[in-house]
Amino acid sequence: MKKILLHTCCGPCSIYPLDTLRSKDFEVYGLFYNPNIHPYTEFKKRRDQLAEYAEQQNWQVIFDDEYRLDEYLQEVVHREARRCQMCYNMRLRRAAQIAKKGNFDAFTTTLLVSPFQKHELIREIGENLAEQYNIPFYYEDFRPGFKEATTKSKELAMYRQQYCGCIYSERDRYCKPPHRKGGK
């Protein structure tokens, strides 16, 4: 059985990838490393929900419990146009490092389940890091299971967030652009 490290952004997004990988006879371990999540209360909700789901699924997850917002901001400030690229790179780099050190056969991410993420960019970064760290990036398009996972997460009354986690996506989700008077 091959051992794979699944970088995990939250409980709901882990449902379909975890089930799929297990059905393919992978021994799946999770990694919760998400320095992008803001504010701390959101980070804690996502972390706690994942811990609860992992226990229900008898799934071992490595939790980086340190709130690393400063590290994330140092990566993206003044690079806002490339913030998703920087964020994916941070999180997948940590997954590749841990997978390599832990003698995993591959690493992947739950980010591949969301139709709202930049799928090809995630794949490209994962493959580049795989080459850099000499550990395979397992690519699978998990998006076909997004609706199924959403339904299941609602049935399980899981905490479901409304934005990717970063302060920029929170702004984009909730803040309406100001109306301008007298012009376009």
For the regions a language model picked out, list residue spans one by one.
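Nucleotide-activated chemistry modules centered on ATP-dependent adenylation/adenylyltransferase
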Residues: 1-184
